[in-house]
Amino acid sequence: MQSSVNEFLTPRHIDVQVVSPTRAKITLEPLERGFGHTLGNALRRILLSSMPGCAVVEAEIDGVLHEYSAIEGVQEDVIEILLNLKGLAIKLHGRDEVTLTLSKKGSGVVTAADIQLDHDVEIVNPDHVIANLASNGALNMKLVVARGRGYEPADSRQSDEDESRSIGRLQLDSSFSPVRRIAYVVENARVEQRTNLDKLVIDLETNGTLDPEEAIRRAATILQQQLAAFVDLKGDSEPVVVEQEDEIDPILLRPVDDLELTVRSANCLKAENIYYIGDLIQRTEVELLKTPNLGKKSLTEIKDVLASRGLSLGMRLDNWPPASLKKDDKATA
């Protein structure tokens, strides 16, 4: 197989093996020799450190002043309860922080299903055990759930407000990442007479709040955005004003008609002045459900179509709409 020294192979075979709802194996081949480790390690680091998610950041338990306490009638001590709270898989739809309550008494197991949820909060693992109560036991607590990224120790959230914080509000080290495990291996691949190529196999497991395939797409998008600066690398010999407009993904400038939604969904979006994909992804699920004639079926359709393009609802665009889009709108008018 003859090829130019400036031409590189790109994966022509992509296989996604769904092992379980929370685990998948993604295989890409062929890759030039060495690119398996280059891409695999970069994606692995992003998946572990940069995926946004939700976690319990603070807990307030009735009758507890500090984490080294014990609660009468509760099998676990407070430290064990806090560790169990870290295992909750929570999704927030439309909000960055929410306070939840849990109240249970009498003999039995306290699970995530006992937490009282708001309409825009979802717990993916309702069977997750938090504590075990005896007949005389009772557990009442408030949980603060926040959206974040990566790992955040409790002391990093300390501020001047700590002095005024009431005693008994326990801070938790929080792992926001929905990725529970990520591993990759590089195997040999062959294309015609070339036998020194790479095959990248990524084994990814999440906590259920994020689909494994979507996690890969988001990680690849982050990597692409970070590398974009190197593509148009320029020196600082002249002061250059960098317009945020240049960083906008071209797909966001396309009309929502390009998503090929059903007529009902498309008309509902236009009725809300949502004409571009960039307009759509900034809306939350809660906001869209308030749209007349747009139900959960249409919402699911919109989410699936966006996910197929590596996008999702509730994304933030600081520089939207871009100046060029405004000019086009004026010209059309």
From Swiss-Prot:
EC number per UniProt: 2.7.7.6
**GO biological process entries:** DNA-templated transcription
Q: What class of enzyme is it?
A: transferase
Q: Any keyword Iron?
A: no
Q: Where are the transmembrane segments?
A: none
Spell out the GO cellular component terms annotated for this protein, sorted alphabetically and separated by semicolons.
cytoplasm; DNA-directed RNA polymerase complex
Family that this chain belongs to: Belongs to the RNA polymerase alpha chain family.
Q: What is known of its domains?
A: The N-terminal domain is essential for RNAP assembly and basal transcription, whereas the C-terminal domain is involved in interaction with transcriptional regulators and with upstream promoter elements.
The name this protein carries in UniProt is DNA-directed RNA polymerase subunit alpha
Organism name: Pseudomonas putida (Arthrobacter siderocapsulatus)
